[in-house]
Amino acid sequence: MEIFQKAKAVRLRSHHDKYLVADEDEESVTQERNGSAGAAKWTVEIIPGSTNLIRLKSAYGKYLTASNKPFLLGATGKKVLQTNPSRLDSSLAWEPIRDSALVKLKTRYGNFLRGNGGLPPWRNSVTHDIPHRSATQEWVLWHVDVVEILSANANSDHHHQHLQLQQPPSPLHHSDSLDFTPGSPSRSDRFFRQE
C-alpha cells in the first residue's frame, strides 16, 4: 500500500481514537490517547521481495508480532506483542489493506490487528482476530498518521542496495585517504574537501 511505501515512521490510531503504543515493559502493546509519546511511533520496514507486506518496529527496537498466545482463555483473540526474534518470520508480517481512508492490517493467519474496547481486561488491549459481530467490525480499522517520510535519496539508496545485493561485489580498489594534491581542493561525488 502506497502510504507505507513512502513512510519511514507512522502512528496508528484505532476506531476508539487511541494510538497503538509499545509499552515500557518492551513486550506488551496497548492503546493510549497520547499519540505524541515516542512509544506511539512505529518504524516501517518493507519486507524484501514483497510489495505489500510490512514489519513495524517499536521505539524499543522490537517488532509488532502476531503471537499464537490467547489473550483470554476461551476468547478467539490472540495477543499482539513486541518481540525481537532471532529469525524474522511471518508472525512479524502485516499486510495493509485499504478500507476507504482507513487501513486494516492483516496477519499471515488471516486475522486483523484489532484495538479492543469495553470493560477491563479488554479496554485498551490489542489483539489479532477476525471480527464476528457487526458491533466490532470497525475495531480492525486504523487511521495511519505518517510521522516521517522517506526521502527520495533513501528510496533510491534502498533500491540501489537491493540491486547491489543481486549483483556480485565489485573488486575493492586501494586508495589512501591522503591521495590528493596539496593546496588544491579535492572533490568527489559525495564529499568536498578543501585545505
Model-assigned labels for residue ranges:
Residues 1-195:
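Lectin-like carbohydrate-binding module/patch detector with strong preference for beta-trefoil
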